[in-house]
Amino acid sequence: APYVLWILFATYLNGYILVKNPDNKIVTQNVLTTNIDTLSNSKNRQTMKHTLPQLPYKTEALAPKMSAETFEYHYGKHLQTYIDNLNKLIEGTPYAEMPLDEIVRKADGGVFNNAAQTWNHTFFFLTLTPDQQPMPEKLAAALARDVGSVEAFREAFTKAAVGLFGSGWTWLAQQPDGKLVIVAESNAGNPMTRGLKPLLTVDVWEHAYYIDYRNRRAEFVKNWWDLVDWQKVADRL
């Protein structure tokens, strides 16, 4: 059985289920691109504007599990607003020259919220696919080693996502010691702030599912599983 650790923060709970983390190499570039996993090579410290990521699929391609209308609002409006707010907030500050992941790790207040939501949403959208392939063996083996089985992981992750009070994100991440971790984060929370490496996330803010599912978060999470790009998740190990 996985080792479970609960940490109380102020007025909300973040649930940890310890289940794997080499060195962190996710995002270290100022501009969002089509592949968040390749953003670690930029050493430029010049000021750049954050922009919407280009999606590797058409916005209608995930329907009916995720409709084009949901993408119009979730991707085209909500994410765009976070990006616009971030660009305004960091203009003329040291954050304007920082990679996005560095902003997430160092900032607080409004800068953190908008930077983290920009990072989180980009990561979420770029881990979806209309053509899901079987989970690669190395990921399945890691989950079996640390959680017991792939099914046990899905059950624990689903419970964390559906049970998260209010808005937030549920993550599969890697610890520095190599264990996989399920982290339930409220609001704009991101496991990079704890020294963890994100592998997978689901957005459980209401704007992620309300158009298609109204208040049926559990149904949204159930259908989201069919849209996960397991190869991308495995490549992050």
Q: What are the functions of these language-model segments?
A:
Residues 44-237:
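Feature for soluble, non-membrane regions of globular proteins
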Residues 1-39:
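Polytopic transmembrane helical bundles with strong interfacial aromatic enrichment
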